[in-house]
Amino acid sequence: MGELQNRAHRRQSSRRIAVCCAPSRQDRRRPNASLCSATTPRRLYGVLLTFAAIAAAIAVSPQSAQAWGPNAQKLILNKSIDTLPPDIRAFFDNGRAQLLEHVNDPLNEKARKPAERHNQFLYLDKYGRFPFTQLPRNYKAAVAKYGKSKLESTGLLPWQVGVYSARLTEALRLGKWEEARLDAAILAAYVAETHDPFNTTENFDGHLTLQNGINERFGTTLIDRFSSFFPMRPNDAAFISDPTDHAFESCLAAHSEIEIILLADRNARLNTKPYDDEYFDRFYNQAAATLIHQLSQAATDVGSYWLTAWTNAGRPQLPH
């Protein structure tokens, strides 16, 4: 799990937020719409839903899951620096360029190293019903109950957050400042992923509900189109007593938002072309509160994990 940091080092030794309606098309860029088939007639819905589920089981791998897009990761990281107390903000602010350069390392590594993909999701709905108490949060206990192969197939995200939280703590304790910034960037990426609802479900791209590609529309396209127009208001960073357990809680909270997003997508698709500007305007208007909340919570948590690592390292004096 340290491969990302090593490769990077070699390269470079509260609740809902009120949002505005979608801005007019004249006020923003309009990237090309995604391609998708037209809405399915009602009489065929049941048949096609069954077919989609069968086809998904054969053709779709969990490794295909799409996380927050690159711009989402950078947006979260930028906002997270503002959550930090003055004692440590300068260290991260002065390293902002380096952090932004490496925050998408896990996403890029996923294409090169298949095993990395397991670190970026946790399919909670593979473990019964909410709050998914069948899954132990202690890694050794989870392995003893389900086996390593089962855990890898359903995702290791919260445990990966715990691993990199410990790595950052150790780097700060030893005064390895460059290594600490690299670990901080990678930790930020994993923490952000715990707030992406579609990282927490086997319906990760909408294939089980005939809403294929919804994860990309929600986590990438809406942000690329509208991020200049919505407010993110993360809270101040706070100490986290158990980094791994907190990551599980973030995944649970994100999972509870899935139905809201699926409904917003279904409503936006009514009487619109797939997927035109009108669709994205309508999808944004209905899903923006959830999107902004998740991004804001992610930024709060990234700052909190950094603060926690520094505190657990003994509050060392950081270079400016």
Q: For the regions a protein language model found, what residue spans apply to each?
A:
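Bacterial N-terminal signal peptides
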Residues: 46-59
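Cysteine-centered motifs
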Residues: 20-21, 36
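Low-complexity, intrinsically disordered or signal/transmembrane-proximal segments
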Residues: 5, 9-12, 26, 45, ...
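Catalytic Zn2+-binding segment of zinc metalloproteases
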Residues: 192-206
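Short polybasic linear motifs
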Residues: 40-43
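N-terminal, motif-rich segments that launch catalysis or mediate targeting to/interaction with membranes
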Residues: 61-182, 186, 202-296, 300-320
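Extended, hydrophobic/aromatic-rich amphipathic alpha-helical segments that build helical scaffolds
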Residues: 185-193
